[in-house]
């Protein structure tokens, strides 16, 4: 019995607690990201935003959650019931499981694997399936077209994102996310030497998360909300939880790859007195603000413009940068040992 507790059950309980320690705060962060978005965009449009439910509207996300929870789930006639229900669950779960390899501070990671970057890339690549399944299972031409757009868009920008990440891996000499952060401790944050790729990566994560100005899969004027047009109640909410969860995830990945993860801006007092996890969350908040700022500022791209940018600008640009990075590191004997 002691062997069972020590060898199997206790480690399993610890893993479950670690997962809950990430998932529960993440759900709260997603809820209040929707509140922050409405407040920030309201301020940019010179209005108040939500201000009725609770002081300063702080209970608005809870009210929205209760409203969606109490609504009826309607499945359209002719829809594939099983796939229709699985699609939003898949989108939401994939947004959560990627956090297993994200280090919040030195040693603060659930699974510190040596191929953390590959794991993230694999999980983000699977995200498109939930949207395609939703579009196909809804038995609606608008939803189906939105799903196809999403697939083309995400695949197009994932290629460029992969090449940008290769440039960072070459500089750090590791695919372990903690090692990439520690490599930036020795020199400079990678957004300085790789600044063009940093800008490209920011634009690519906007496309990857289907956010404005690349929200073509849910273009209201053309597709009546796109792939989620037939969804209501909690399945509808799960799509938005997945979208906002992916926003936070991509912000965390950007902070790790280019902004030094949990490292302070300068390694001197009083900056290094602040815990690393605080710096990490501040960087995520900064990138999330960029998401909201872009949404309030830029009009939606046309579909052909979106594809042209991905295939004719980002793909060759990131490929050339990888070749230049590799050539520079080899020429000056700066490859990580």
Swiss-Prot record:
It is an enzyme of class 7 (translocase). InterPro entries: NADH_UbQ_OxRdtase_su1/FPO, NADH_UbQ_OxRdtase_su1_CS. It is found in: Cell inner membrane. Its main location: membrane. PROSITE patterns: COMPLEX1_ND1_1, COMPLEX1_ND1_2. Its EC number is 7.1.1.-. GO terms for molecular function: NADH dehydrogenase activity; oxidoreductase activity, acting on NAD(P)H, quinone or similar compound as acceptor; quinone binding. It catalyses: a quinone + NADH + 5 H(+)(in) = a quinol + NAD(+) + 4 H(+)(out). One of its GO terms (biological process) is aerobic respiration. Keywords: Cell inner membrane, Cell membrane, Membrane, NAD, Quinone, Translocase, Transmembrane, Transmembrane helix, Ubiquinone. One of its GO terms (cellular component) is plasma membrane. Signal peptide: none annotated. It is a multi-pass membrane protein. Pfam families: NADHdh (PF00146). The chain crosses the membrane at residues 13-33, 82-102, 115-135, 154-174, 187-207, 248-268, 274-294, 313-333. Belongs to the complex I subunit 1 family. NDH-1 is composed of 14 different subunits. Subunits NuoA, H, J, K, L, M, N constitute the membrane sector of the complex. NDH-1 shuttles electrons from NADH, via FMN and iron-sulfur (Fe-S) centers, to quinones in the respiratory chain. The immediate electron acceptor for the enzyme in this species is believed to be ubiquinone. Couples the redox reaction to proton translocation (for every two electrons transferred, four hydrogen ions are translocated across the cytoplasmic membrane), and thus conserves the redox energy in a proton gradient. This subunit may bind ubiquinone. HAMAP family: NDH1_NuoH. This is NADH-quinone oxidoreductase subunit H. It comes from Rhodospirillum rubrum (strain ATCC 11170 / ATH 1.1.1 / DSM 467 / LMG 4362 / NCIMB 8255 / S1). The gene is nuoH.
